[in-house]
Amino acid sequence: MLKIIIPTLMLMPLTWLSKNNMIWINTTAYSLLISLISLSFLNQFNEDSLYISLTFFSDPLSAPLLVLTTWLLPLMIMASQHHLSKEPITRKKLYITMLIMLQLLLIMTFTATELILFYVLFEATLIPTLIIITRWGNQTERLNAGFYFLFYTLTGSLPLLIALIHIQNITGSLNLLLIQYSAQTLPNSWSNTFLWLACMMGFMVKMPLYGLHLWLPKAHVEAPIAGSMVLAAILLKLGGYGMLRITMILNPLTSHMAYPFLMLSLWGMIMTSSICLRQTDLKSLIAYSSVSHMALVIVAILIQTPWSYMGATALMIAHGLTSSVLFCLANSNYERTHSRTMILARGLQTLLPLMAMWWLLASLTNLALPPTINLVGELFVVVSSFSWSNLTIILMGTNIIITALYSLYMLIMTQRGKYTYHINNIKPSFTRENMLMALHLLPLLLLSLNPKIILGTMY
């Protein structure tokens, strides 16, 4: 594990000691190198070596998320170059340092062995994200968004800490490798019901569950591009990862307790998809689509079959890359037209034909077209939910149709039609941006050739 953590840590002095004209090149190149090193974690079960120490370990569930985390840092740095170009040099360095610190905390969160350590790191990821949103956001509402973000996440996860300490008292250990062998079965009683709720609520808020999702659109819309990317791609996955890890302690109570949350997720996924259809703000639309995709993941985790677990992990990785590329595209529009309103930035296909291709690919990935891994994840989830209850196929089908509708609506609103007169003199698309989109979409297409590396522990 240290072969990733130490190089990531050393990216900070690299940022501050680089020459002013070399900051972007150095940090991007070295972070890309780190992400290539981390690819070896995906292959660990074909060899004899296990990546396990007393503090950090990596297994097929955390490895794909780990690789996604390291893969996104160079992409975030590439995406942030334009809107930081007018900032003074110390601020650029501080911004990159925040991103590196966030990546470091996320790597340690996904690989923590001890649940209390996991909790501490889970909370620590709030700090850099909050600074990024409230310091570099675009509008003045960013402070409001920061408050929402902090308040929801902290209030949701305080009961989790108390529950973890309680479990520590009962079992005597919170080590993830030991607890699956020593965990006692939780009988159905009032106190255990509250224990289940306390354990799940922190992750449900982070996912977010429909009804607890109000912080997400606010935070997404106000965050700068790197903030939006890391929020959609990785911070939401912390919730799913935590749920997958902690359900093995809470059995067999989950099968009794899951019903209201399953209903809420199934209802919420259709509701948030429908909300997407009437959004005017591009970033807000992508944020609500994130909520709808994560509702599918919650359903999959709560059904608790091997197929649904595989679907949940595949969908988390797929959604991480998809939502990230959509935010990048929205940002490239915003940098040219200085507006996130879709009506004001329409007809861009005539001006930026190459960007239109990226928009088409990203929209098709979002509506889960084969051969992307979004389809793999959604198929697993739909099939496992159908075998749980036949009625869910109606809700799932409706959701898939509405997803297709808003994805195509987003594409048509931004790319088609006659362009408005105020965007005659926009800049062409840069090589940097094309590279950025390619590095997002290539993994999505290539992973469909070998999806077993992202199907998690159950494969």
Swiss-Prot record:
GO BP terms in the entry: electron transport coupled proton transport; mitochondrial electron transport, NADH to ubiquinone; mitochondrial respiratory chain complex I assembly
Membrane topology according to the record: Multi-pass membrane protein
Principal location: mitochondrion
Localization per Swiss-Prot or TrEMBL: Mitochondrion inner membrane
Top EC class of this enzyme: translocase
Claim: Transmembrane helix is one of the keywords in the record: yes
InterPro entries: NADH4_N, NADH_Q_OxRdtase_chainM/4, NADH_UbQ_OxRdtase, ND/Mrp_TM
NCBIfam families for this protein: NDH_I_M (TIGR01972)
Summary of subunit composition and partner proteins: Core subunit of respiratory chain NADH dehydrogenase (Complex I) which is composed of 45 different subunits.
Protein name stated in the entry: NADH-ubiquinone oxidoreductase chain 4
Organism whose genome encodes this protein: Rhinoceros unicornis
